[in-house]
Amino acid sequence: MTVPATSTRKDLMIVNMGPHHPSMHGVLRLIVTLDGEDVIDCEPILGYLHRGMEKIAENRTIIQYLPYVTRWDYLATMFTEAITVNAPEQLGNIQVPKRASYIRVIMLELSRIASHLLWLGPFMADIGAQTPFFYIFRERELLYDLFEAATGMRMMHNYFRIGGVAADLPHGWVDKCLDFCDYFLTGVAEYQKLITRNPIFLERVEGVGIIGGEEAINWGLSGPMLRASGIRWDLRKVDHYECYDEFDWEVQWQKEGDSLARYLVRISEMTESIKIIQQALEGIPGGPYENLEVRRFDRARDAEWNDFDYRFISKKPSPTFELSKQELYARVEAPKGELGIFLIGDNSVFPWRWKIRPPGFINLQILPQLVKRMKLADIMTILGSIDIIMGEVDR
């Protein structure tokens, strides 16, 4: 009896990764086609966290809509609030006091650090390094203490308002934040010592998921995904929004375009954010923290507002104003990339159209191309380096 020669196995295996799996970043489902350990194809399936955020906006005033926007990217809620108030501010040409602008910059950069920290921990856990996952919560708790002292909430802050912020910084907060900045720089140095030159870490990320500069532009990538491919593009420098021009800081970038480059960009961005925060805290001016002119009601004061129902059951409407009949695109540099809003007003208090441009949704589109011809284990490395939050992707 002759034994047949061993032939190369040609049958492919289809594996579903997610949507309910601890290794996935939210409720993302990947349909992966494998030939052994090699990835032949990958199809992301979205929509498991879709909540109709754009349609909800068309039936709410801006103030009523603010609590919803913190549920997009729930790890960097200051940015979703910022873009939600920036769009009507630009549409109505509403001026923001200098102190309010400084407070906004401080909160935005603290939120950027918090987002990058909670990217770093799970990313390292994805590739097998468990220790940094516990380290990042040490600094993150201090950040949330600062947020809680200033806004009353550890997450979902609901702090930004049209024309300023909801409340001034409490007494002693500036000194507490400066102490955190000094402490955090030692924490970043510890991360770099622990991770950056680790040979096992380098083996997992170096040369994995390479994106060229022209390719990144063609795919519409933004944020660290774009800057890690050699493109020095940061909306804080390009659009000159808030008061970023008044601070001395540099755009962080790398030219390699791989997962290691994206890691290095985010680590460096945390250090640059600390520089911006320190300058803002030391130079924060006095004055009002909101523009009182925008807090007006559309209709005259009603005598019924002093009755029991209105005083104790809170039936007073939110202060708001009409959105003029024009269109506008506003954007900010969020931790994950360009977060934009396309707003169309029609002389009512509700937006006629509220189109969200989420960075995670755009950045995720390149995933199938990056993982093809890679190993199965590299999928989590590449997906982690993209940094997505499904609340923002699905909206």
Swiss-Prot record:
The listed locations are: Plastid, Chloroplast thylakoid membrane
UniProt cross-references to SUPFAM superfamilies, sorted A to Z:
HydB/Nqo4-like (SSF56762)
Q: Which GO terms describe its biological process?
A: photosynthesis, light reaction
Single GO term (MF): quinone binding
The highest taxon in the source lineage is Eukaryota
Q: Tell me how this protein sits in the membrane.
A: Peripheral membrane protein
Q: What is its EC number?
A: 7.1.1.-
Which terms in the GO cellular component ontology are assigned? Answer: chloroplast thylakoid membrane
Q: Which InterPro entries match?
A: NADH_Q_OxRdtase_suD, NADH_UbQ_OxRdtase_49kDa_CS, NDH1_su_D/H, NiFe-Hase_large
- Keywords attached to this entry: Chloroplast, Membrane, NAD, NADP, Plastid, Plastoquinone, Quinone, Thylakoid, Translocase, Transport
Main location as per UniProt: plastid
Q: Which reaction is this enzyme known to catalyze?
A: a plastoquinone + NADH + (n+1) H(+)(in) = a plastoquinol + NAD(+) + n H(+)(out); a plastoquinone + NADPH + (n+1) H(+)(in) = a plastoquinol + NADP(+) + n H(+)(out)
Assembly, in brief, is: NDH is composed of at least 16 different subunits, 5 of which are encoded in the nucleus.
Q: What is this protein's function?
A: NDH shuttles electrons from NAD(P)H:plastoquinone, via FMN and iron-sulfur (Fe-S) centers, to quinones in the photosynthetic chain and possibly in a chloroplast respiratory chain. The immediate electron acceptor for the enzyme in this species is believed to be plastoquinone. Couples the redox reaction to proton translocation, and thus conserves the redox energy in a proton gradient.
Q: Which HAMAP family match?
A: NDH1_NuoD
Please state which protein family the record places this protein in.
Answer: Belongs to the complex I 49 kDa subunit family.
Name of the protein: NAD(P)H-quinone oxidoreductase subunit H, chloroplastic
Q: Which organism is it from?
A: Chloranthus spicatus (Chulantree)
